[in-house]
């Protein structure tokens, strides 16, 4: 049916809605100069510690340059004009170094270690004794000569031969190169970063006894069990297993007392995302807010190939969202997800294997550039919007790097200043045609399993002027509302009614405000507006369910910017058109209202607004099409109303005449029907019935409107018309 809409309740202002874990609704306001204000739904300003001023600097149009999403008590705030960067933090670097592991030993083996530095090669060589000796003492010495730690000790340069070593040794010292011994492992390292070297280790058993580790090794299993702390080496991945290269470092700081080789990051590469360029977080502790930078996890393993920085580095983030327990960003043509359950980590924790929880970084595949603007959860997947295409990001039961996929679903041009909104099983997004806007309704056709987006403004191509800059949608109220940049005082609501998969009714209309609507958002059956009146900003609420005034009255009090006044309360704004209504339904002056309040009474004050419904031109038609070969003369019309206190029927028989020459007829319905059961003195009559009125006008020329500027409700269920159709001619 057609009903006069509920009034807005006056409060004080804002922009992004925050639904906290305690189910309180607050609003975040960020002004052009970076000023941040947070208020609750009653307009009370909340305490805020703002440490994010630099991130909000340089704003010119916060409504389009900022975006945010809230989960529990965390709100992620994105400045779309900021380019995300790496910080200068890097993994530790070490001087050139290597390990020589005496893995085996035997009798009569020669071990040779050659080190080249500065173009000169230095060689040191030792030999173990033979197993067969002339005496028992010599045999004991021979056994000592094959001890691996003794061999390692005597292969070192810049040291004298170990006392009582029973083999033979020879070799020279090397400037700028140092040696340390860890059991049967020699640690060779330069005195500075410039003291690099190469080395070769051989033995007379075909290389089975000596192993060298410098820079890279092909076999992780052959790494020694002893090493200096934090020695880093690259392990070549096994291509047959699809394994990437990875890095390990020696770690002696373990709880079980056994040192291990632990996966790590390549030395000397960047590790950190600059938090000052990343989305900031607004946190709520139950009483106050804190806005500031968020520490995102460092890269701890791999290198720039195996574990690269996320693709939003060097780009601007266009949207932020949550999907399947991951924090997500849109940047350029990429969708970037955090690690599952770890919202601040965008690096893999291991590159040895690809785990299901690892971060995801995937680009859309399209034959044209598709900069992703918005992401909207839809039908267990994620709907992605670019200017010319729509994509569906989906996965199997789990969203993982291996199961994620992005497919083009539809190719419709979109006007994406306003973020698309979902309502039920539909997603609505704006389009632009010249100076006017339209709206498409995205859905999945269950019968054909195809995606489509119907243009629900095809019949009103010139109705919505300008570019849509803000949207609000509600599945509770089956409604989508639009604001454009053409006239900020106008809101375009689209009301629809579905039964199953069939849309039985839908209608567009306009709400004209006395102030400029800057923002709107649904909260269940409440629609909140941030409205500017001159230099004042108000947070206003439109309630689509039960009117709050019914707690004091027997009728809804339909006034815009309505407030409840008791005691010494006064109207909190100035408007010469404001009226005062007592709980008995009487309209009184401001002074009379003050007297009534002083006596303990309650008064509702606000600004009257006008409901206008204009009937479409009446057309005579058969089952297939309109019949235009005759004259349709309107005789009478009947309007079925319910719980209605007042309305006017305004008819203009000749709408095509100049305004000064038109005749306008106005008929008033007051709700007081003689003999009616609701016509009781001292009460507000709300009647239900049928109102009939005459027309006597040509359907092509007649303009028929239902109007009401009363604070009393009116609701129209249906209408019927009596007419006479006269054909101009008949077939012979």
Task: Annotate each PLM feature.
Residues 1-44, 219-319, 323-371, 434-451, ...:
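N-terminal beta-propeller domains
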Residues 2-5, 295-325, 331-477, 486-488, ...:
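Beta-propeller and closely related beta-pinwheel folds
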Residues 2-7, 11-19, 23, 437-732:
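Beta-sheet repeat architectures centered on beta-propellers
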Residues 12-15, 21-22, 59-64, 68, ...:
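Short alpha-helical segments and helix-capping/turn motifs at coil-helix boundaries
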Residues 28-30, 77, 328-329, 382-385, ...:
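Conserved beta-strand element within WD40/beta-propeller blades
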Residues 41-46, 54-57, 61-108, 182-205:
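Hydrophobic or amphipathic alpha-helical targeting/insertion segments
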Residues 74, 94-103, 126-311:
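Long, charge-dense tracts
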Residues 86-97, 398-414, 609-626:
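A short, polar beta-strand/turn micro-motif
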